[in-house]
């Protein structure tokens, strides 16, 4: 009886193994017949060449670099980030020499500092189109611009503004020439969006105190400077601690952000690459950018963490 039971079990196992083999063979034959490839990652960036993303040397750029990097990585792209490269003049050399493939830039800066155009476009759209045309002439292109724009501006303490009746940049001309000290990065001395433009458009002769970006507010607070070059999306400007002078002659231009990308890289990465970056840019309005800048500058949060939280909240990572 035991032999009979054993024989039945062995026969059953043999049939099961044969069935599995037949099933696997059938599946293989079906795949071969249809030409279906083996299962692969559904992420559009899987298997694409790695890209190198750069950013400049201040808080907003650190956040933008992380936003674009993490969004691309969520889609399967491999991204190497070169952070804190420096000013536009420096990072542009990294781009044109092939050290980086893309970076976020301000449209007005492209026109004034890279294309060396001093004629101001009529509006933000005109500035974007002119900047895009310039970049396409160099083998690059601009992706979509952000809703927010972050322009340079001159800020003063409210007491200083009240004492000297200052509301606009033009009002500084009422003060004795050379009596006003401005705190700004070293490149402010040679930029049209700096001493050159302020002189030609407003007739201002300002003394420059070179400062690393981020130290201008402390210099204002301690009366080391009378006015400072600031960015309009700085977290420090959320309250009423500082007065920002308006720029009626638009020396500081229109400054929406758009990624500059090598056209060769776009071609190699496929349409989802640009779509991913554009989806991030579309969410970056003035309020969102000010909040993220404040989180880093005032609350001392890590830019990578701030970017991660924003992307998650907006369904982008």
Feature roles, as predicted:
Residues 114-122, 128-143, 224-227, 236-250:
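Ligand-binding "clamshell"
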């Amino acid at each position: 009886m035991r032999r009979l039971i054993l024989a039945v079990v062995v026969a059953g196992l043999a049939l099961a193994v044969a069935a599995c083999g037949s099933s696997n063979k059938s599946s293989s034959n079906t795949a071969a017949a249809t030409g279906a490839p083996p299962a692969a990652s559904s992420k559009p960036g899987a298997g694409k060449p790695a890209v190198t993303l750069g950013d400049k040397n201040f808080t907003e750029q650190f956040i933008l670099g992380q936003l674009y990097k993490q969004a691309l990585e969520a889609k399967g792209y491999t991204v190497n980030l070169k952070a804190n490269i420096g000013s536009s003049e420096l990072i542009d050399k990294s781009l044109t020499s092939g050290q980086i493939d893309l970076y976020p830039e301000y449209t007005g800066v492209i026109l004034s500092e890279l294309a060396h155009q001093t004629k101001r476009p009529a509006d933000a759209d005109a500035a974007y189109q002119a900047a895009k045309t310039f970049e396409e002439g160099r083998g690059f292109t601009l992706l979509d611009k952000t809703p927010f724009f972050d322009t340079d501006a001159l800020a003063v303490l409210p007491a200083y503004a009240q004492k000297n009746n200052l509301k606009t940049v033009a009002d500084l001309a009422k003060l004795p020439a050379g009596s006003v000290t401005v705190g700004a990065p070293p490149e402010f001395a040679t930029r049209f969006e700096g001493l050159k433009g302020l002189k030609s458009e407003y007739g201002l002769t300002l003394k420059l105190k070179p400062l690393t970006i981020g130290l201008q507010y402390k210099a204002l607070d301690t009366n080391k400077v009378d006015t400072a070059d600031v960015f309009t999306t700085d977290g420090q400007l959320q309250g009423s601690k500082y007065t920002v002078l308006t720029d009626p002659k638009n020396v500081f231009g229109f400054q929406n952000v758009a990624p500059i990308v090598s056209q060769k890289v776009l071609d190699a990465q496929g349409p989802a690459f640009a779509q991913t970056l554009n989806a991030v840019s579309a969410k970056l309005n003035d309020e969102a950018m000010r909040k993220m800048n404040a989180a880093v500058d005032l609350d001392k949060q890590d830019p990578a963490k701030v970017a991660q939280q924003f992307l998650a909240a907006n369904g982008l990572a």
